[in-house]
């Protein structure tokens, strides 16, 4: 690439703390862009509850179209108690499902890292959790959440778990490709001792692995995997699983760092990637400059990975770690005897340290 690389970002601040945490993510993107020779242009669009209030739709057509025309989508958070009684397509969260469908994404990436500086914040023993670095690769469009038939019957209810060979194969390829960039180990999680769908899952994943002999593969039943995530999380590198099991396991692992404010996510595989923090809109602290922007900033790092700016993505992660190592803590992480860093102050620290982690005119890798 030349020195005129540029990326158009569809910025969806959303509700609650979404605007303030993604604002810091954009600050960091601009800082590392200057250091790595690319520019970022972010254009704001409405989504979620704020879009409902203004347009009557949680995902206006104009927002959807802008996302499809962008290089990446950065989302803050959607929803809140104001819209808690809404149903169907009048729920703010329905806009997120519609956006994922429009973008065609099928792979959800959920990194869970416990930086050494924050090991004491974990509910687990620091010597067991410190240094944890797991990437959950969750299939996002199939499984029991979308299988048919489903619904209430005269005497009960039914849900259907279903996967096709192709759906399993494509998500397995994502997991093996990501493992090659990391430590080269994939743990595939299923329930093949009970479920026929899981038997197929294990068979197809094993077949895909035949084409990736440089990556190590092991299989775990989901109940054992849940125990192992708590017992020894550092054993995992990439965890590959279906929609239901991935939903549960990634939320279980989300407790390891000690704050949802540290957890980013990406939904990829379609025309454009969607990047968002795992946490919700937290309306009770919105607008107070106290929210932790780390998850949004690390989501921006995933965005950079996806568009090929891997050195800049690593610089962002280094900036977060450096700020934490220097003792900067937002309110959710600060000890009683520590001074809190505001949302904006923490974002500035990360931006400065991320930009300074490489020479100003570093060559493109």
UniProtKB/Swiss-Prot annotation:
Residues involved in NAD(+) binding: 80-93, 280-292
Entry EC number(s): 1.1.1.85
CC cofactor: Mg(2+); Mn(2+)
Pathways involved: Amino-acid biosynthesis; L-leucine biosynthesis; L-leucine from 3-methyl-2-oxobutanoate: step 3/4
Catalytic class of the enzyme: oxidoreductase
One cellular component (GO) term of this entry: cytosol
Transmembrane segments: none
Record has Amino-acid biosynthesis as a keyword: yes
Protein keywords: Amino-acid biosynthesis, Branched-chain amino acid biosynthesis, Cytoplasm, Leucine biosynthesis, Magnesium, Manganese, Metal-binding, NAD, Oxidoreductase
Quaternary structure and partners: Homodimer.
Name the UniProt record assigns to this protein: 3-isopropylmalate dehydrogenase
Organism annotation: Salinibacter ruber (strain DSM 13855 / M31)
């Amino acid at each position: 690439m030349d020195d005129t690389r540029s990326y158009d970002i569809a910025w969806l601040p959303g509700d609650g703390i979404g605007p303030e945490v993604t604002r810091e993510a954009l600050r960091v993107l601009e800082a590392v862009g200057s250091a790595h020779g690319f520019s970022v242009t972010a254009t704001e669009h409405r989504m979620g509850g704020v879009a409902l209030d203004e347009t009557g739709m949680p995902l206006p057509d104009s927002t959807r179209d802008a996302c499809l025309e962008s290089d990446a989508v950065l989302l803050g958070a959607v929803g809140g108690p104001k819209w808690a009684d809404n149903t169907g397509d009048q729920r703010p969260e329905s806009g997120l499902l519609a956006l994922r469908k429009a973008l065609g994404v099928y792979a959800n990436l959920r990194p869970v890292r416990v930086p050494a500086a924050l090991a004491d914040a974990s509910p687990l023993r620091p010597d067991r959790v410190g240094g944890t670095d797991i990437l959950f690769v969750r299939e996002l469009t199939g499984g029991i959440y979308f299988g048919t038939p489903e619904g209430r019957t005269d005497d009960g209810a039914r849900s259907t778990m279903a996967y096709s060979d192709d759906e399993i194969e494509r998500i397995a390829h994502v997991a093996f490709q990501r493992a090659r960039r990391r430590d080269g180990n994939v743990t595939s999680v299923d329930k093949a001792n009970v479920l026929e769908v899981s038997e197929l899952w294990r068979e197809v994943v094993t077949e895909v692995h035949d084409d990736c002999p440089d990556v190590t593969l092991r299989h775990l039943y989901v109940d054992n995997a849940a125990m192992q995530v708590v017992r020894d999380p550092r054993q995992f590198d990439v965890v590959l699983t279906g929609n239901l099991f991935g939903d549960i396991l990634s939320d279980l692992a989300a407790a390891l760092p000690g704050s949802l404010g540290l957890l980013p996510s990406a939904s990829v595989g379609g025309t454009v990637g969607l990047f968002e923090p795992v946490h919700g809109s937290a309306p009770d602290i919105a607008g107070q400059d106290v929210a932790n922007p780390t998850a949004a900033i690390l989501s921006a790092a995933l965005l950079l990975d996806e568009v090929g700016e891997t050195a800049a993505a690593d610089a962002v992660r280094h900036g977060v770690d450096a700020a934490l190592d220097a003792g900067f803590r937002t309110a959710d992480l600060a000890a009683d005897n520590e001074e809190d860093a505001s949302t904006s102050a923490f974002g500035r620290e990360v931006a400065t340290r991320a930009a300074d982690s490489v020479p100003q005119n570093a060559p493109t890798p």
